[in-house]
Design a protein with these regions (language model features):
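Transmembrane beta-strand segments that form the barrel wall of outer-membrane beta-barrel proteins
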Residues: 24-30, 54-65, 89-101, 124-136, ...
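Outer membrane beta-barrel transmembrane domains
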Residues: 164-197, 206
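Cleavable N-terminal export/targeting peptides
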Residues: 1-19
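Short loop/turn motifs that connect adjacent beta-strands in outer-membrane beta-barrel proteins
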Residues: 13-19, 86, 121-125, 158-166, ...
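Short glycine/proline- and aromatic-enriched beta-strand/turn motifs that initiate or cap beta-hairpins
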Residues: 15-65
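Residues that define the transmembrane beta-barrel architecture of outer-membrane proteins
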Residues: 16-20, 39-43, 50, 72-76, ...
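Outer-membrane beta-barrel "beta-signal"
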Residues: 157, 189-191, 195, 216-228
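Detector for outer-membrane/organellar transmembrane beta-barrel domains
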Residues: 105-175
Length: 228
């Protein structure tokens, strides 16, 4: 469920070439769509295979600090995507039941979601996404699927010293997994910069301030990434 961070060194391939990318994000805390995942300092590895606009991504999160709780935080997600120009569509299988919990209970512990994303381009770097859960454990008190939906808008701003500033806002339009009515889930401001280590290697570093109106919570998160 995490947001991808650009990795260095990087290679550019033609769209019809098979690509393999791996990375590990290290984050001071794990906040997803305004919700604290009770993870604390965590490692979030991912593996992505891509070909001709299609990709399959496996993403995970594992707490490195909060082991003294009943169920330590652990997540394993699978994402299937297709991208063309500025548009992408993704189908995700989320599982976040925790350490030593069974994975195969698809009706009770997996959340299946579809996401549409559109980026307007470099001249107007606004990105809009709409994500709706359509199967699995996303059910109301009556056991019926509730179609929990999350809408996000972000705008990337390039600043001097190669710093990128990204304000973003998230909203849920109706009652569901996120809240009992329509509400703003998260408002954030993220600053990122690639820290040069050598001429051929840099480490992306970010700091993000997050306000979660529906939970009346605030967070200040930092992290860095390594990958190929």
């Amino acid at each position: 469920m995490g947001t991808a961070i650009l990795l260095f060194p990087t290679k550019t391939y033609a769209q019809d070439k098979f690509t393999v990318n791996g990375k590990a994000d290290f984050v001071s805390d794990y906040i997803w769509r305004g919700a604290d995942q009770n993870s604390g300092f965590s490692i979030q590895p991912s593996l992505t295979l891509g070909y001709a606009g299609f990709s399959i991504n496996v993403w995970g999160s594992q707490t490195l600090s909060r082991w003294n709780v009943e169920i330590p935080s652990k997540e394993f997600d699978i994402n299937l995507s297709y991208s063309s120009n500025n548009f992408s569509v993704t189908v995700s299988d989320y599982w976040w039941s925790g350490v030593n919990r069974p994975y195969g209970h698809y009706k009770d512990s997996h959340f299946f979601e579809g996401t549409l994303t559109y980026c307007f381009g470099k001249s107007f770097p606004l990105t809009l996404s709409w994500s709706t859960m359509f199967a699995g454990a996303d059910k109301n008190e009556e056991g019926k699927l509730q179609g929990s939906t999350y809408i996000n808008a972000s705008y990337q701003i390039s600043l001097p010293a190669d710093i990128t500033l990204t304000p973003a806002i998230g909203f849920t339009p109706w009652k569901g997994y996120y809240h009992n009515k329509a509400a703003f889930t998260d408002i954030s401001l993220k600053a990122g910069k690639d820290i040069k280590i050598t001429d051929n290697f840099s480490i992306p570093l970010f700091v993000q301030a997050i306000v979660a109106p529906i939970y009346d919570r605030t967070y200040l998160v930092t992290g860095f990434s390594l990958g190929f």
